[in-house]
């Protein structure tokens, strides 16, 4: 959103009965502003450059001829696709020097009819280039003895992407009188994400005897992701009489996503150590090619009603509140792919040159000319939520109490195009009901001091696609849905102290406790792990088959902590600081590989269960931020420096004892400086990530091959680094111009 459209950002640490219950971590509410009393017309222009592309090129591919629909969608379900139905330009890659980033926005607003009606309109455009490098080491194989990780590959990736964002925002408001007003807000935003990835995949298990050897796959992936969202919200505030007020809101939203002709061109070779110590390289041969179309559409209709009845009881103000919510959401997902097999042109395969010289079997067409639409990724799903609440608010001179209860009913269902006689995942449904009581106290200790206490229940509802049988490989591992996923339910306690010492100076301190039943986490499964508790080919469960990421419920978790924040100004200099400590813990049975007879090293390896105690996935014990602000209104200079620290946390959980992926702590910094040239114009400079922050993810296992170079990218012997991502700074210069 352009900043001129935002009136304020509201952060709620706890919930009252009128708020939706799906908010274990609290609520952030973006309040948009109405048209101001005076005319508004502002322009902002910004340009910048990513340091990544100063020393490294941008990997580009052609997008003009990408077909937005697959042959199945264009010609119908009985059409036999041929090679001429597929462009080759999106698999022709070249290195270029990208143009600078370009960002712009324009805002106009005005009031009419004696200030009763107002309109504010904004448009924005962004063309941003991004680049990064990383490596990733998956543990796709079952762990070895004593849970030594089953590392299989070393992926070295270089990403280049262009993000083109467009947005149009409008807000109309009309004040009938001081007690009655309506507003209509509309938002349309679109994103085109054009991404290329160059990857070198070196096997750590096939032919890897010394550094520089092993089976190697080289691939270039082209992926265009198109997204757009439209939302229209109509709302009204009405003071019916001195006691009764009514608020209502209805919202209609549509979101579309499309991956058209997402493809990856790859070839394979091998570097094998010879008996004399030399290394021989085999010819580079073309690998099979898959071309994917994936699209989805979500439609959401929501209606809210809030009734407040106020009356006086002795020296207190009593407010009785009631209301409800109805939401209907529908999601339609479509997935299709075509598989091309290389033609055999030599006794070893087909030597690879480029996409224009590649030859495929089936007359250069796909092996499955009808496509592959009958899969769990082609489905329709719906979600219906009904909610109601009742609360009492009692306000005295010092204390304010709010107590009440909220109920929510949820009904989710899906049906896919899977043939039920061939596979699982045809259809399913989930229904549940929640009662969410809450109580809050706000006590005014003095004019400058406030004490707040609250207790409430909340929930976390899985996304609609997470409870289907979808299975898509977005990156170096599969992502799968989980229809057996349960919602999380939390009991929350919170105590907070606030001190307002004048001006913008604030100190806040608090403690909190949460008990979370059925928390769900992002878990990485290796090929043999259970994906679903459904019998499959003689097994009592369905195995993942490949490295797979899936949302899973964990045992009941307990989390508690403290937080403190402060804002203090010393003349022109301001300091903003905050710190949060969180302790979270779950105990769960994990698998461990050991000998059937520990005293006999030749006995069979078997899996046993060990209890493991660890934090929740994604929960860092330490979060800290520090901001330095400088403002000189006389000279027109403003500057800011902000740092955010995130402590170590579990990046991805594992069902194997001691094999969670741990992300190291990291610090991110941003800096900016602004100069006011006159009453209507400002220029600014901004730099993001000047520290060249690197993201490191480790297995907390000793590194037996450290020093031998068999696993690249390692810097320590006491752990195994499985992911390292590097992004360089981005520099921006811009202009803010108020034309009125």
Protein language model regions, located:
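C-terminal beta-signal and adjacent terminal beta-strands/loops
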Residues: 518, 645-653, 675-740
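Transmembrane beta-barrel wall of Gram-negative outer-membrane proteins
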Residues: 88-198, 228-230, 241, 437-439
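Gram-negative outer-membrane beta-barrel transporters
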Residues: 513-515, 533-649
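Transmembrane beta-strands of outer-membrane beta-barrel pores
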Residues: 47-51, 125-129, 188-195, 252-258, ...
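Surface-exposed extracellular loop regions of Gram-negative outer-membrane beta-barrel proteins
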Residues: 358-368, 447-492, 511-549, 642-656, ...
């Amino acid at each position: 959103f352009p900043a001129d459209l935002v009136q304020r950002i509201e952060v709620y640490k706890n919930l009252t009965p009128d708020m939706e219950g799906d908010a274990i971590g609290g609520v952030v509410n973006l309040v948009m502003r109405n048209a101001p009393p005076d005319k508004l017309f502002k322009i902002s222009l910004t340009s910048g450059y990513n340091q990544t592309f100063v020393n490294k090129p941008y990997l580009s591919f052609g997008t003009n001829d990408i077909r937005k629909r697959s042959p199945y969608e264009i010609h119908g379900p009985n059409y036999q696709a041929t090679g001429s139905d597929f462009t080759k330009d999106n698999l022709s890659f070249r290195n270029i020097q990208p143009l600078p980033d370009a960002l712009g926005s324009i805002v106009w607003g005005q009031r009419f009819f004696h200030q009763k009606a107002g309109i504010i309109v904004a448009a924005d455009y962004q063309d941003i280039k991004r680049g990064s490098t990383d490596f990733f080491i998956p543990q796709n194989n079952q762990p070895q003895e004593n849970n030594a990780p089953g590392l299989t590959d070393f992926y070295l990736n270089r990403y280049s992407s262009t993000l083109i964002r467009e947005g149009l925002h409008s807000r109309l408001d009309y004040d009938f009188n001081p007690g009655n007003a309506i507003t209509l807000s509309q938002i349309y935003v679109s994103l085109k994400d054009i991404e290329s990835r160059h990857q070198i995949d070196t096997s750590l298990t096939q032919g890897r005897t010394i550094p520089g050897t092993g089976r190697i796959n080289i691939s270039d992936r082209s992926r265009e992701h198109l997204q757009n969202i439209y939302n229209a919200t109509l709302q009204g505030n009405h003071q019916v009489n001195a006691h009764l007020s009514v608020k209502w809101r209805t919202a209609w939203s549509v979101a579309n996503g499309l991956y058209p002709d997402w493809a990856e061109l790859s070839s394979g070779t091998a570097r094998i150590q010879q008996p004399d110590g030399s290394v021989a390289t085999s010819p580079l041969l073309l690998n099979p090619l898959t071309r994917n179309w994936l699209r989805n559409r979500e439609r959401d209709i929501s209606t809210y009603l809030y009734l407040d009845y106020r009356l006086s009881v002795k020296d207190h103000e009593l407010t009785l509140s009631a209301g409800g919510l109805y939401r209907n959401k529908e999601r339609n997902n479509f997935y299709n792919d075509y598989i091309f097999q290389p033609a055999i042109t030599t006794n070893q395969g087909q030597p690879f040159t480029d996409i224009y010289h590649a030859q495929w079997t089936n007359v250069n067409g796909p092996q499955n000319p009808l496509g592959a639409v009958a899969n769990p990724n082609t489905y329709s799903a719906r979600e219906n939520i009904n909610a109601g609440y009742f609360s009492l608010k009692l306000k005295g001179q010092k204390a304010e109490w709010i107590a009440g209860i909220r109920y929510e009913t949820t009904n989710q269902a899906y049906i896919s195009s899977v043939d039920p006689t061939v596979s699982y995942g045809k259809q399913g449904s989930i229904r549940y009901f929640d009662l969410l009581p809450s109580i809050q106290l706000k006590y005014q200790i003095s004019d400058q001091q406030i004490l707040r206490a609250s207790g409430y229940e909340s929930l976390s509802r899985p996304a609609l696609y997470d409870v289907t049988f979808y299975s898509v490989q977005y990156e170096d591992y599969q992502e799968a849905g989980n229809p057996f996923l349960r919602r999380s339910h939390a009991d929350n306690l919170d105590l907070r102290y606030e001190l307002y010492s004048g001006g913008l100076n604030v100190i806040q301190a608090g403690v909190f406790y949460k008990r979370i039943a059925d928390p769900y986490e992002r878990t990485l499964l290796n090929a043999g792990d259970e994906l679903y508790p459904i019998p499959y080919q003689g097994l009592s469960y369905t195995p993942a088959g490949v490295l797979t990421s899936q949302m899973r419920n964990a045992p009941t978790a307990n989390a508690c902590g403290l937080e403190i924040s402060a804002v203090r100004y010393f003349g022109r200099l301001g300091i903003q600081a905050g710190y949060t400590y969180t302790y979270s813990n779950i105990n769960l049975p994990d698998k461990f590989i050991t000998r059937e007879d520990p005293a006999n090293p030749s006995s069979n390896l078997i899996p046993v269960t060990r209890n493991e105690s660890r934090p929740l996935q994604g929960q860092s014990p330490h979060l800290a931020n520090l901001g330095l602000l400088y403002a000189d209104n006389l000279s027109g200079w403003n500057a800011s420096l902000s740092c955010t620290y995130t402590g170590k946390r579990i990046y991805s959980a594992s069902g194997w004892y001691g094999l969670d992926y741990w992300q190291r702590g990291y610090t991110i910094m941003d800096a900016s400086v602004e100069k006011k040239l006159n009453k209507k114009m400002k220029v600014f400079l901004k730099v993001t990530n000047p520290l060249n922050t690197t993201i490191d993810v480790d297995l907390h296992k000793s590194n037996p091959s450290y020093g031998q170079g068999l696993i690249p990218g390692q810097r320590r012997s006491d752990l195994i680094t499985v992911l390292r991502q590097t992004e360089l700074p981005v520099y921006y210069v811009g202009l803010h111009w108020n034309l009125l």
